[in-house]
Amino acid sequence: VNVLEISRLSLSLGQQTLLRELSLTLHPGQVHVIIGPNGTGKTSLLRALFGELAADGGDISLDGQSARQMTQARWRQQFGYMPQNIQLELDLSVIEVVVLGRLDSLSMRLADEDILAAGRALQALGIAHLADRPLYSLSGGQRQMVLFAQVLLRDPRIMMLDEPVSALDLHHQMQLMEHLCQQTREQQWITLVVLHDLNLAAQFADQLIVLAGGDLQAFGSPARVLDAPLIERLYQVPVEVSHDHSGIPFLRTVRRQPG
């Protein structure tokens, strides 16, 4: 069974504890959204899973096989990873950037199917009209969509996106998240996404991972996890929580009255 097991994972940066003995079991076909205040280890968790940050303790395993038992290259082949704030000033067209998702090394040769797959990814995200544009000419939001298309081509078992909608307008936020959810189910990915928009997280998450103060504060469905006491404690703002007809929570911050 394609299960990602995080067992007592601890991370620190200097004297700062980022994660303290975090344990989670993540299943395929589900979107796991990581939320929490700034500086609570959300990005660090993704980087540790990808092997960019060395853990102080604990273990990460896939299908019962520890990351320690694999070479770093083989472990990373399991992932499609889109970090936040990628700075790319490449003199390449959009279609060329996307098709790089199929390359494990620059010595590999591309097949016609790779080009077709890149075109399909752009079409699915509604940005096929950008295919021949140079990447450097695009807006920040357009670049985010292009990089998401590139990650789609990696055919991963584990998909990780760090704030993938931060530069997107409302239409493209919905388009990216809807496509991500659809592909997660169809391809049976184990998907992890860092989001700051709690209502977007509530709408698209199968499971929420709530981090704060180095600890796992909650893990479960949005309907079970997102309540006013938790959000007010973590974010230090008053909120009201309502639910739509399907039980999905909706959060509204309450403006503090002056004086």
Which residues does each PLM region occupy?
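Conserved ABC ATPase signature
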Residues: 134-138, 142
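Catalytic Walker B motif of ABC-type/P-loop ATPase nucleotide-binding domains
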Residues: 159-163
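The feature captures the beta-strand-to-loop junction immediately N-terminal to the Walker
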Residues: 35-37
